[in-house]
């Protein structure tokens, strides 16, 4: 069975914010960890958008449409952590979000997202765009 990452801990007052979706969530994107930003209309988009990447999104249900409100997480914990490509997080490794929405261990042109603990948990602390 494939790992299904979830937000394990989050403080809604300081660890996330809400925004409407700019586009429908694709079925292929369900149960994957994505890096999100906002477009020039303030709607949530996969990738950097107009704002630069702001947080992490994991959707678990099909049928979410443009305009639906979602949570974008900026701080908290994800468990079990897997990259957007489905690779399990490596303990002690830093992970980065990219302009295309993917999250991996490549720092080049990426925003710091967090690091992984010994039990495979991502400690989420998204870097604020400059």
Residue ranges and their predicted role:
Residues 1-130:
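Surface-exposed, low-hydrophobicity beta-strand/loop segments enriched in small/polar/acidic residues
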């Amino acid at each position: 069975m494939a790992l299904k990452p979830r937000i394990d801990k989050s403080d809604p007052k300081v660890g996330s914010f809400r925004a409407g979706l700019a586009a429908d969530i694709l079925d292929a994107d369900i149960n994957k960890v994505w890096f999100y930003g906002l477009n020039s209309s303030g709607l949530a988009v996969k990738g950097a958008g107009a704002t630069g990447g702001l947080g992490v999104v994991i959707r678990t249900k099909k049928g979410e449409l443009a305009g639906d409100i979602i949570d974008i997480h900026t701080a908290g914990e994800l468990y079990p952590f897997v990259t957007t490509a489905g690779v399990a997080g490596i303990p002690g490794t830093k992970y980065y979000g990219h302009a295309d929405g993917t999250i991996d261990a490549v720092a080049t042109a990426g925003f710091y997202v967090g690091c992984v603990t010994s039990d495979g948990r991502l400690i989420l602390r998204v870097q604020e765009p400059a």
